Amino acid sequence: QTFEFNKDNVKEPDIKEAKKIAEYLASHPNIASKRWVYEQYDSMVGTKNMSTNRPSDAGIANVKGTNNAIAMTCDCNSRYVYSDPFVGTQIAVSEAARNIVCSGGDPLAVTNCLNFGNPYNENTYWQFVKAIEGMSSACRKFNTPVTGGNVSFYNQAVMNGKTEAVYPSPVIGMVGTVDKSKQMTLDFKTQGATIYMLGEIVDDINCSEYLYSYRGVKLSPAP
């Protein structure tokens, strides 16, 4: 059912609707800034946080007395995993690795928190198995051993008289090391700097918030 999706059947927005879509997505809870939550925490406690004034794609913790810091990130898009557990979990590991690398670090190792529904449900157990296989495949690619983690089953609720499981969520936690002199930050460094887009650019809206929430298309392949 998922792979019967055809993007050509999705309405192409005009300029007027495009503005409406942009406003809708910018205010959506899954996209809107969470700054009002995390800025309430005193991030300077212990003076180890190197990301407070110089934000990176990963959190950076200073290792005092050395030239190194620790980069940390957590990533998962459960919609990708629901669509394709193997590929979706590969994407989660890949995103974590990118966050470490784009912060100036080298990925070292992975932990995880695997959240699924009832394992006695055949589809749920299949999702679980394929997610582990996807994680294993990606971790071997990045040479990041899984040092530990936990599994949480029976994440479900009764909705309209029917038991519904959460979307499968294999959350990936990754750590890496950063040479403090090479920490990368999010901001552009100089006016007029050249910006490069790396990799192949494809016309892909699969599993997007736009498709899922705005257009109401709940099933589409993972990107």
Regions found by a protein language model. Give the residues of each.
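Glycine/proline-enriched, intrinsically flexible loops and inter-domain linkers
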Residues: Q1-P223
